[in-house]
Amino acid sequence: MSRMAEQQLYIHGGYTSATSGRTFETINPANGNVLATVQAAGREDVDRAVKSAQQGQKIWAAMTAMERSRILRRAVDILRERNDELAKLETLDTGKAYSETSTVDIVTGADVLEYYAGLIPALEGCQIPLRETSFVYTRREPLGVVAGIGAWNYPIQIALWKSAPALAAGNAMIFKPSEVTPLTALKLAEIYSEAGLPDGVFNVLPGVGAETGQYLTDHPGIAKVSFTGGVASGKKVMANSAASSLKEVTMELGGKSPLIVFDDADLDLAADIAMMANFFSSGQVCTNGTRVFVPTKCKAAFEQKVLARVERIRAGDVFDPQTNFGPLVSFPHRDNVLRYIAKGIEEGARVLCGGDVLKGDSFDNGAWVAPTVFTDCSDDMTIVREEIFGPVMSILTYESEDEVIRRANDTDYGLAAGIVTADLNRAHRVIHQLEAGICWINTWGESPAEMPVGGYKHSGIGRENGVMTLQSYTQVKSIQVEMAKFQSIF
């Protein structure tokens, strides 16, 4: 693909130049080619985006629930009509295989938007009787202008996960995509405008997170920030949001999730789940089950089944429909993953496969890392303690149920967890003891629109998707009505 035109900001229904004069480049990680130069939003751009959003939000909130629902449903239709085009752009920007982006990223994002479009008319208050002459009723009102700050691994899906409930509740959103993968969020803004969203209700500000993101979290005109990213960045966003104007926050942060295989499990099923929990999207998924616990007596058989499946991974041309494994999102991220792999070797973990970059004409110019499986791991190893966010699986052994539950919970993270077992009683007994917000039994990774997702501990605050997320983009107003004569004590 030839280099794209310089990308601008999207404010008040159209593209506009950044006042900062600063730019950055986004690359195709499969081959290192520059895709586009992108303008970076500065403080003045954030100010005008907020003013635009405030104007648009008043118009949007004044519409009836059905009017808002129809506009968002039109956006869903456009997303599905343009699925292949958007998936190709997402593949170029992220490096993910087209077989994945065309069937997951836009599809699941559109599903979430459709879900919330349908919920808009059901957003309602309640009536509380006090006595015969008095009652209270409540209204759920929009927060106003909210900000979404996205991560680089699922750019358009995250933009939809954040904007769908916010817009459904009557808010306007200013969205800052990751500077690593900024392109499809701008296309989403076009689609919202085409669907009939009032100008200013969805503005997109590409920029460097440490600057543009901070301007958003500092701004007094923003009522809430929804952030997806790493724990350290999330803590800064939360601190800035509280210090500036006591903003509400949703934090979807990192994970180091356990996948527990029990001795009664079908090992073929367990190996299939472990593969998806570690190598889907080249391991760049926050919910990955990177700590794979297996009974000592099952270790050798499990390892062989995993190795057989790793051999079936198809890396290469990301637009080949048979390819199911792409490069990492950037060269700095590739280098960071390689440092973790080197640390694992240094600390005594044994490499079953991988452990280096992929080599060959198809890979030499891209950010490729081979699918890597470590075994003979211990809980104190760096690769077991810290989030790597790459195609790196760590296999650990255990002897008893109580032991594995204790070790699975021995982490600052609490995003996801899963178990594989044929025993239904054990499945529920163990899952109820795991300290994680998203749990799976005999499966892994699905996050449908109806399912609230979010973490315990350092993995986050609040939830995305589900009914409760729509409510989190509203504030409750309580009104008492008195029909009897008011009695004053004065």
Curated annotation (Swiss-Prot):
Enzyme Commission number: 1.2.1.8
Name of the featured protein: Betaine aldehyde dehydrogenase
Cofactor binding note: Binds 2 potassium ions per subunit.
Gene name of this polypeptide: betB
Upper classification of the organism: Bacteria, Pseudomonadati, Pseudomonadota, Gammaproteobacteria, Enterobacterales
One Pfam family this sequence matches: Aldedh
HAMAP family: BADH
Active site location: K162 (charge relay system), E252 (proton acceptor), C286 (nucleophile), E464 (charge relay system)
UniProt-annotated binding residues for K(+) 1: T26, I27, D93, V180
Cofactor(s) in the UniProt record: K(+)
Family assignment from sequence similarity: Belongs to the aldehyde dehydrogenase family.
Subunit structure comment from the entry: Dimer of dimers.
Site (Seems to be a necessary countercharge to the potassium cations): E248
Membrane-spanning residues: none
Catalytically driven reaction(s): betaine aldehyde + NAD(+) + H2O = glycine betaine + NADH + 2 H(+)
Keyword Metal-binding appears in the UniProt entry: yes
Modification type Cysteine sulfenic acid (-SOH): residues: C286
Organism in which the protein naturally occurs: Escherichia coli O127:H6 (strain E2348/69 / EPEC)
Keywords: Metal-binding, NAD, NADP, Oxidation, Oxidoreductase, Potassium
GO biological process terms, semicolon-separated: glycine betaine biosynthetic process from choline
Function: Involved in the biosynthesis of the osmoprotectant glycine betaine. Catalyzes the irreversible oxidation of betaine aldehyde to the corresponding acid.
